[in-house]
Swiss-Prot record:
SMART domains: REC (SM00448), Trans_reg_C (SM00862). Keywords: Chloroplast, DNA-binding, Phosphoprotein, Plastid, Transcription, Transcription regulation, Two-component regulatory system. Residues 82-100, 142-246 bind DNA. NCBIfam families: ResRegRpaBCyano. The gene is ycf27. Pfam families: Response_reg (PF00072), Trans_reg_C (PF00486). It comes from Cyanidium caldarium (Red alga). It is found in: Plastid, Chloroplast. This is Probable transcriptional regulator ycf27. GO terms for biological process: regulation of DNA-templated transcription. It comes from the Eukaryota. SUPFAM superfamilies: C-terminal effector domain of the bipartite response regulators, CheY-like. The lineage of its organism: Eukaryota, Rhodophyta, Bangiophyceae, Cyanidiales, Cyanidiaceae.
């Protein structure tokens, strides 16, 4: 089912995937009131059908569902798209949380959750993407970097390794952009969460899970480094967080 607010000329189209009817209805109503166009699916197979026939900007994806679970949906979507995916999970085991991130999810929210928290996550991710796109100036050499077998073009959002195009998710690219554009500068995990994911990290905010950063760093290293176990581009700043080694444009 799709609901649109025609007053908003450029709506982001969200897909909510959850087998709990109450959750789908609550989120659809709240997100529609915020000006989003919303589609819903009650299982993984239905979600993939909607995804292939609509232009979706962000997916809210439950893990435990019939027919095809959230992990399977995430894997299928990542074969052809880098759109943001937020996982909803009632599983509190660390491995379960990390599994979704390793499969390509950008963030996760644990059930039961506050709708306001999820709304804030959605707004932060979409705002980050919009802000990044607005800031980049065309044909600006400062957005071009070459190191070893890598060519990084921040303006075109293209990364080539050995002349082969490397696909990154939106959040992977945002993380890489932060580190590369300020190469040589170390960022704490908390600072990365604030800059890339939009976490405010104030005393009123829920404590963010810094493993989100660690898993995304691992994913970037797996895609960009010749030897991910011995990285030469994205380095660990001992006692701090991460940094990109100093690059020259």
């Amino acid at each position: 089912m799709r609901i649109e607010n025609k007053q908003n000329k450029r709506q982001h189209h969200l897909l909510i995937v959850d087998d709990e009817n109450n959750i789908r209805k609550i989120l659809q109503t709240r997100l529609t009131l915020l000006g989003y166009s919303v589609s819903t699916a009650c299982n993984g197979e239905e979600a993939l059908k909607i995804f292939t026939t609509h232009s979706i900007d962000l997916i809210i994806l439950d893990v435990m569902m019939p027919k095809l679970d959230g992990y399977g949906v995430c894997q299928e979507i990542r074969k052809e798209s880098d759109i943001p995916i937020i996982m909803l999970t009632a599983l509190e085991d660390v491995l379960d949380k990390v599994t979704g991130l390793e499969l390509g999810a950008d963030d996760y929210v644990i059930k039961p959750f506050s709708p306001r928290e999820l709304e804030a996550r959605i707004q932060s991710i979409l705002r980050r993407i919009q802000t990044r796109n607005a800031k980049l100036k065309p044909y600006d050499n400062i957005n071009l970097f070459k190191t070893g077998s890598l060519n990084i073009d921040l303006e075109k959002k293209q990364i080539y390794k050995n002349n082969e195009l490397i696909r990154l998710t939106e959040m992977e690219f945002s993380l890489l952009e932060l580190l590369v554009s300020q190469s040589g500068k170390a960022f704490s995990r908390s600072k990365i969460l604030k800059e890339v994911w939009g976490y405010k990290l104030s005393k009123h905010e829920p404590i963010a899970d810094t493993r989100i950063v660690d898993v995304h760093i691992s994913r970037l290293r797996a895609k960009l480094e010749d030897d991910p176990t011995n990285p030469t581009l994205i380095l660990t700043a001992r006692g701090t967080g991460y940094l990109c080694r100093k690059l020259i444009t």
